[in-house]
Amino acid sequence: MGGMRLGFTPFNAELDYEAAFPLAAELGLDLEVAYDLHEAFPLPGARELRATGEALGVGFTLHLPFVELNPASLIPSVRKLSQERLLRALEFGEALGAKVGVLHTGLSPVRHPVAERLAWEALEETLALLRDPPLPVALENLALWERALVRGPEELRRLLERHPHFGFCLDVGPALVELGP
């Protein structure tokens, strides 16, 4: 996946793209494009963003969809829709020229051994579907969510060992919360 480069999500910083591009160029940062927002709002398309990024020397990462999405859903129709959205997002990321797509691994809202086993099987199905993506995919740590299927660094490490073609995206905030005081 190459070396590490820092980036930021403009919308988390309450910046539109017009303000975010010059800041990213000045600081030598990538922009993390949140695909969910491009599904929900009238925002510039992938090719327009790519052209602006190329003109200013700004690269991109793509945060794959996570709003109302669960790649580990126990409900087959929800999982199928989640998979379809992920594939569309990867096409968007390819057109954007994104260096990587960042993936949340899903939720397990039902804490029962059978439900958790089925959720893990569902996640494995989704990850198999993403085995040959048009851009690298990195799995993100999610310690902040009690309902996260993958909990803790050891579970994430084991998942990445089973799927070495995926990278890892460290979200420092959840990692610090998980470490505790």
Language-model segments: residues:
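Nucleotide-sugar-dependent glycosyltransferase donor-binding/catalytic pocket residues
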Residues: L43, L149, V177
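Active-site-proximal loop/turn and secondary-structure-junction residues that shape catalytic pockets
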Residues: N12-E14, Y35-L37, F66-E68, T105-P109, ...
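Active-site acidic/histidine proton-transfer and metal-coordination neighborhood
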Residues: I75-G167
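N-terminal pre-domain/capping segments
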Residues: M1-R88, E94, G167
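A short alpha/beta connector and helix-capping loop motif
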Residues: L179-P181
